């Protein structure tokens, strides 16, 4: 107060005011500070000082012709003096007002297109709903979040090429637009921005916003998708939160969400197939998300999630070096360890072989609903500081940390046998056995862990074995904190390897990820996911398997037909018939298969019994390993719609219905496509199938030697003729076609020609 009074007294003297306003500043250090470099040192002051001048703005000389010297009120708009050091003129702020009111109007059509991200943001905010404000402690943790809604996922380099091509097409410099998304965007933007008068630099900035994902490492308590991050400052403070529902979704969030669902489904499905890695790759390459190839999205999208990272690893892409256990992401922040195999005994005297981490290490653990700091030594938990949204989330984190510590009291707390298996019915590894066991019931674990008295530390409280908070006692080494633990901020990616069972390891051989870590959470994808692989047919249930199997046969009928007659074993082993087996009652699979294969063999042996519809209908049943039995069936059962439904061997049924008039096939009442071949014409279909590529010339001609069997035909050279034995011992003369183009007509004409030749 004293000083303020003193200053007031000084200022009331006119001499003080004069010294402060008139004296020149001639101290070199000060002059240097304010004049070196282009960077403005005090922008706010500079702005106030400039705007106090009459003509603070400079403009191009041409402005004099375009703006009057005075406005309607008679105020001067520009000065006749030139700007010192340039050939521009000095202009008053009033000139800007005049220009805005009376200047030339330009077309506004490009503004919404160039400033698309802003216009869309306004729409989202207009339609969003803000709820009540709640005052409570916010557990925020820093996460890497996407701050730029509505962007494509191009890399900086790809985007740069697109921007140069759209905004500065005549500029020199090699630009290679390779990816599909680059080409599509370039074409679209060039059309949109024809005759655009907006400054090219501005257009370039705005395009960058649209094309590139921008991430920041920000403290977040709630939703992390970009439409929530853009209103972060409105929805959460230090001690308050405001409920908010976005007024629209953006494609980049939908892509992230759908990618995670697709990856989880694919990893789960691959785990149960004979060669998980090959299956996973086949599915990733044949899947589309929102019309874009999944492999393209994986290459560009930085989403870090267990299943997504397994898919990336399989494709040879780099992923984050943190590892996953129990749904938590672990990042070692200090210390080191060596791994040794050790045998331990559970409370049930079962022997487990575990890889023990020997040495002192510190980790951060980050999950969706809880985070923690863990300090451990060899098979000993030293300290665990955990924070989470609720009691349940905190308990989950504690269980994972206790199992991870490999402490003896945890292993001794096991009651009963450990025999958890994965989806492919393989036993889980010991660490995951323990984890599953305690995730089911952790009561004994918490009771046996031990408790200790605690000191009063700010922001920390204890937690008892029944998961209630306490200020006096706590589980040994465990504390609950109000503060969250930040996610690992680095975006560094490392080279990893993956084995055929989808275990991902870093270059030191540490397992970072395995299918056990993939969440079982089911969600509904925002974008359409199209799985073209037959392995994913069952994702939509038994009906989908049934329809897809038959559609596949119809689509590939031309090749299936030839294989059916020449190489049935190869046909039966096709992976497209694999999903169908799950619909056939286990006990009947082998019998059905034996029966159908015998029936097919009879068709091949006896001319005139070939029946396209029947072959299509029964083919999937022949794929199972056959049992040799004399059993005959008039109908075959499939398990769909929660019960067994019958497919009639001869004739139509609700499951499989062929309409002769329309030549269309209906499966469970749904249209499954048209058959191109007329089944009645198809009585000699085997021959017509085999004789594709041959012209039937007429009756047998002895000059061309003894009759060949159908299988021997493949040795003929183009243009060569031969007699061939068909069906019931009839012999016809054929010639191998010189051109392949006419092969298609052979199947249809062969049937008629065979009849003519025989008669």
UniProtKB/Swiss-Prot annotation:
GO cellular component terms, A-Z: host cell nucleus; virion component
Marked site positions, Avian adaptation: 627
Keywords per UniProt: Cap snatching, Eukaryotic host gene expression shutoff by virus, Eukaryotic host transcription shutoff by virus, Host gene expression shutoff by virus, Host nucleus, Host-virus interaction, Inhibition of host RNA polymerase II by virus, mRNA capping, mRNA processing, Viral transcription, Virion
Record carries keyword Ribosomal protein: no
Presence of the UniProt keyword Chaperone in the record: no
Gene Ontology biological process terms from the UniProt entry: 7-methylguanosine mRNA capping; cap snatching; DNA-templated transcription; symbiont-mediated suppression of host gene expression; symbiont-mediated suppression of host mRNA transcription via inhibition of RNA polymerase II activity; viral RNA genome replication
Motif Nuclear localization signal, residue range(s) on this chain: 736-739
Localization, UniProt: Virion; Host nucleus
Main location: virion
SUPFAM superfamilies linked: PB2 C-terminal domain-like
GO molecular function, one term: RNA binding
HAMAP family to which the protein is assigned, alphabetical: INV_PB2 (MF_04062)
Protein role: Plays an essential role in transcription initiation and cap-stealing mechanism, in which cellular capped pre-mRNAs are used to generate primers for viral transcription. Recognizes and binds the 7-methylguanosine-containing cap of the target pre-RNA which is subsequently cleaved after 10-13 nucleotides by the viral protein PA. Plays a role in the initiation of the viral genome replication and modulates the activity of the ribonucleoprotein (RNP) complex.
Subunit structure: Influenza RNA polymerase is composed of three subunits: PB1, PB2 and PA. Interacts (via N-terminus) with PB1 (via C-terminus). Interacts with nucleoprotein NP (via N-terminus).
Family: Belongs to the influenza viruses PB2 family.
The protein, known as: Polymerase basic protein 2
